[in-house]
Amino acid sequence: ANGQLADDMGIVMGTSHHEPMMRPHKDYTKRRKEVGPWNYATNKEGIDSFFIEGAERSRKYESIVTIGMRGDGDVAMGGGTDEENMAVLSDVIKGQREILGRVHGKDPAEIPQLWAVFTEVQRYYDKGFKVPDDVMLLFCDNNWGYIRRVGPWQEQRRKGGMGLYYHVDMNGGPWNDRWINTTTIPKLREQFNLAYQSGIDDLWVVNVGDLKPKELPIDFIMRYAWNPDAIQADETDDYLRQWAQQNFGEAHAEAISGLVARYSKYNLWRKPEVQSTNIFSVVNHCEVDRVTDLWRTLAHEADSVGQLMPQAYKDAYYQLVLYPVKASAGVAEIYLAAAKNRLYARQGRVTANDYARRVEELYTVDTVMTAYYNKVLAGGKWEKMMSDIHLGYTKWSMPKRDSVPQVVRVEPLSKPTMGVAVEGCETLSPEGELELPVFDNFENRKYYIDIFNRGTGTFDFKVKTDEPWMDVSLRKGKVETESRIWVGIDWTKLKAG
């Protein structure tokens, strides 16, 4: 039924890189006992029969047939050496082409076929494995959106041509990338242009996962594939504005295109499924604070624009802009806040508890936003579309449930107790000697000193400097939780040398 419907609508059908001869892997797993082991060296007859069924079932439809063979599922073939596997693969392809010729009643060279040069298969190609010239070579990215090679010059005249298999969604190693869009338009344009300019332009296959979270990259790739020369490297912002205008009208197109560009960029820094508390530094270059501010600013702007949306656009805005922005911001800040919580707890800061509460608050917000998307938005039209687990990954495979990083609670001391910490150092005074990073007059940066409370109540502090060229942002104050003082150098007061 699917094949007939696709053919009626002019859709060319095919199967994945590990599903040869128009047979989905599920076709095999349902009949594993009947077909026998997925091993061509020991079960040629059973597997050939399986392949014949696929060829016969699809012969009346317009298709492109994946040839070759990998392991049982999306895994490498067998346990032999590359040379042994290449010898088996050669027999597999010879047998597959004989089957295609018999079933279709014509020269196999007249039947569209591809060989996916994917993961371990690229090693075989690089070692000299060849397929007939009429077979398309489907080169692949690295599972994370970077093509592994441009079109080899010696392949650019091959009869079968060259194609690309590209991921904007990944379920597998090295890490999942499923929940939300993490791909920027400039990156997509760069990668597909590399393919296009080097002759990888006969077929582009894109792994889009569950479709809904990846609507933006899907739209761009389809437009770019239609006419690659129409979108130049310096025109990706124009594309985003046109996309925003098409979906939300002219009034807010500029603002929305900026929101979408930035959340995609920030997610590309660190995809949600690969977040941890160790990515950005709490003490160096104010990384955690800077990234937190970027995400919070973005989320605030998305809220502000959302309030201006006409009612007719509200649902679409939530799906395409507000949820991706705020949910991504929430996941990022959960790990950023947890990183601060852990360091501050080791230092005994009472503010460690504030960051523990922040982690819990953000998790609640994430749960509420996701429930709204799944249950309320558009009358529940997209139920379970945003049910992917996206918090608590420790390896590539999806956890059983969302979970936040473990946080630590601090029991304040019974009386106000001062602690001091400086930028670039995780230790604190009076437990260790503190030293600010080196100042220079090129960047002319300022560095901070944190004065914080480890107990209950308040205390007063004063700051003294030994040199007149030292600038401090605060000379005295009262601390209940913490206070940050910025230290800089007035280079005009320093003598040369």
Model features per residue range: what roles?
Residues 393-454:
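Beta-sheet-dominated interaction scaffolds and their linkers
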Residues 441-449, 481-483, 492-497:
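Short, solvent-exposed loop/turn segments enriched in Ser/Thr/Gly
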Residues 2-8, 40-159, 292-316, 328-331:
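Gly/Pro-rich turn-and-neighbor structural signature
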Residues 1, 139-145, 152-313:
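Structured mid-domain segments that build the active-site/substrate or prosthetic-cofactor binding neighborhood
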Residues 454-486:
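Surface-exposed binding patches on compact interaction domains or structured appendages
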Residues 238-396:
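C-terminal non-catalytic alpha-helical accessory regions
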Residues 1, 30-48, 70-90, 172-186, ...:
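The substrate-binding groove and active-site-proximal loops of carbohydrate-active enzymes
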Residues 15-52, 159-167, 185:
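Active-site-adjacent "subsite" loops/lids of carbohydrate-active enzymes
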